[in-house]
Amino acid sequence: MLSLVQKIIGSRNERFIKKVSRIVQKINSLEPEFEKLSDEQLKAKTFEYRERLANGEILDNLLPEAFATVREAGKRTKNMRHYDVQLIGGIVLHQGKVAEMKTGEGKTLVATLPAYLNALTGDGVHVITVNDYLAKRDAELMSDIYEFLGMSVGVIVADLNPQQRKEAYACDITYGTNNEFGFDYLRDNMAYEKEQQVQRSRNYVIIDEVDSILIDEARTPLIISGASDDSSEMYNLFNRLVPYLEKQEKEEVENEQEQRDFYVDEKSKNAYLTEKGYAKIENMLKKEGILEEDDNLYSPHNITKMHYLNACLRAHSLYQLNIDYIVRDQEIVIIDESTGRAMPGRRWSDGLHQAIEAKEGVKINAENQTMASITFQNFFKLYNKIAGMTGTADTEAFELHSIYGLEVIIIPTNKPMIRKDHHDEIYGSVREKFDAIVEDIKERISKGQPVLVGTASIEASEVLSTLLKKKKIRHNVLNAKQHEKEASIIAMAGYPDNVTIATNMAGRGTDIILGGNLEVEIAQLEDPTPEDIAQIKAEWLKRNEAVKKAGGLCIIGSERHDSRRIDNQLRGRAARQGDPGESKFYLSMDDNLLRIFASQSMAERVKKGLKGGESLAFGFMSKVISKAQGKVESYHFDIRKNLLEYDNVVNTQRKVIYEQRQSLLEAEDVSDILADIRIDVAEQLFHDYVSAGSMHELWDLEGLEKALKSDFMIELDLQKLYEEDDSLGEEDLKRLVREAIEIEFVEKTKNLDSGAVRQFEKFSLLQSLDTHWREHLSSIDHLRNSINLRGYAQKDPKNEYKKEAFELFSTMLDNFKYEVISSLAKIRIATEEETQRAQQEWQESMSDIKAEHESVIDNNQRHDEDEQEEAPKVQQVRREGPKVKRNDPCPCGSGKKYKQCHGKVE
């Protein structure tokens, strides 16, 4: 019934395309008029549009003229004319949607249309790409168009200094990577002077490869951190012990004889010790002198040992060299599971990276303390408008809409797509599969057809390369080890009978042109004459025609990825802009996807039915594979959704802190802010000793006097005052405390230079807020690591997390206020020069901070209900009894006051 309705009225996507086609017609009708304009007249359009905006006109009304202006500028500066489908893509992006445009349809050129239009407001436009190379390339390619129209263009890459970054952000249009934009946001919220901040408003963002950034990288928070204690000895110890543990093939075993020391869950990338394993590792630790004879790993004081053990167990059983990571320059470099790219600078969390460093015998870097963090999900929500482009978003349309509110629109291709997609072939073993791939390659190159083979890992690419060498088939390999050669390898991938092996092609960002890349060939010539260029073009045309006759580029997939989208990205490298092309996937029942997610009974039936070298290739298996991929996609979506729900709790708190911090940073005088804080602190302190509405016999005036003296250097004999005038009530005493604190501050500062005082107060507030926020992030992280244990007490971990995170936050704010007033009361107010020196020393102490795009491929499972969690490393705010006041005995039993024990903020 639904298909019948769609045939009559068209799908939502078709109706949308039809609607915006009317705007395209209007843009096209303006083309003859704009062609007649002189360069100066065309350039003047930018000023005209800005004037009209200032007079109240809206961007939507300017769109047809602005797009016609950009199209004409493209023709004059780049000899490139925006096709109608590119205009549709530009409209989709301007409207804050995701444009799905196939490979080779010119997404880079499309971005110029909405970027120019939205930059007219003067609030800036950010264009996000997946790496520095593409950011530089796209900015350079399109800068002629922008600059012709009077728009400035900036690029944000990793090696820029703060001043260069500030200048780039001040441009009308700024290109850069998602990591750099996110880190600059975090660094700006750690600055101590307004002038140190580099970003301005987050107005409008266009994200290239939007599915890669908003989905694949949604689980990887950006983290700025500083080094904590060195624990390399413990990692080395457990790295030495773990190989003695034996792996159990499945979680449940039928008898004790089958029980081993640990088992793994490959879906969640976790490893678990059995009771036998616990006993074995405890005995080893006792022999090493790490555990006492009567001690055990379950003791609370051994929590950190469990942390090291779990990390090393996972490092040895689940993470493999050349598949999950490589060793480069004596460092562990993670390989992106989606793209096959090396990701220098990114580190796994929860000690996993240190465990792998110990495993591979490289230097173990200290674990880091988080100072600031944000996920891409919450960072991009800071923008007023988000838009995105990609070749493959339709399969993720539900997630993009449910999490980001982004609608996916499929843009028609400029020329019909004629790629031939063959049925998958399934073999019984990996070796048989690779042999079949080699035979297929031989057959295709014999007729001059270029072949691109996509592999899921470096190991697979090297195995295939070895087999091809044995057959004397020349080929290029592109993986995380050869990333420097990427551009030159891709430029040659379309040559006749050329064979290229590449780990997943997602995000490569370079088109494979049949016959080779003509522009690259011309660029490689030294001082070419017109005759040289003509000869190169003639040779290229011959090769281009030969490859087309041979069937175009052939894509061979060596296995299916977990995500259909990644498979589609690989396929999309063939048949660009109406060229011919083919694609085919080769699978084996030992491939990870089928081994982990397909049913065991079905796998056994298929293996039994296949004799050596035989394969299956029919529709039934495609359904099985699609179902397996659907399971994985659903699993990962749940993880990302869960991550967002947890991160939203911290995000709300982050917004509060960053808004308060920005107000402090921009304030010339913080004395009013401090006055309000002093009132709050006086109330807080008073009620710690005098409960509201209580009888005077229950008042602890002696304790209040001691607190005033020790924490604020104030001598106030409240008991004597009350004895002299017993009519003094609770409010009167509270007023006396408040006035005493206020008078102390006035007396301390009255003879000092007001400028120096204001500067010192501002610095103290910022420094204290940063310190407390950093410690709060650490507490939140420990809370989150352990919260799933509440499920055993029949409590909802998510609700418990929200409740306790709120209490932690409230306590942190109270402690921040108390500590900053107490500190200012105790110290001598510095001169302006001393304050500047203190600021400089503080900033120098922050110079070793690291900006890391932390990989949480290992970290998602903390929300898995079945996960074996660690207990928290810090005392949690789980208050089921009365609130512990600052001067009460600490509940830990130490005999100290709470404020001097577990309530102390260092």
Swiss-Prot record:
Cofactor comment: May bind 1 zinc ion per subunit.
Using the UniProt record, give the first listed, main subcellular location: membrane
SMART domains named in the record: SecA_DEAD, SecA_PP_bind
Superkingdom of this protein's organism:
Bacteria
Q: Which GO terms describe its biological process?
A: intracellular protein transmembrane transport; protein import; protein targeting; protein transport by the Sec complex
Point out the coiled-coil segments of this chain: none
Q: Where is the composition biased (Basic residues)?
A: 896-906
Instruction: Show the Pfam families listed in the entry.
Output: P-loop_SecA, SEC-C, SecA_DEAD, SecA_PP_bind, SecA_SW
**UniProt-listed Gene3D superfamilies:** Helical scaffold and wing domains of SecA (1.10.3060.10), P-loop containing nucleotide triphosphate hydrolases (3.40.50.300), SecA, preprotein cross-linking domain (3.90.1440.10)
Q: Does the keyword Membrane apply?
A: yes
Annotated EC: 7.4.2.8
The record's catalysed reaction(s) read: ATP + H2O + cellular proteinSide 1 = ADP + phosphate + cellular proteinSide 2
The record, for NCBIfam families, names: PRK12904.1 (NF009538), secA (TIGR00963)
Role summary: Part of the Sec protein translocase complex. Interacts with the SecYEG preprotein conducting channel. Has a central role in coupling the hydrolysis of ATP to the transfer of proteins into and across the cell membrane, serving both as a receptor for the preprotein-SecB complex and as an ATP-driven molecular motor driving the stepwise translocation of polypeptide chains across the membrane.
Its recorded name reads Protein translocase subunit SecA
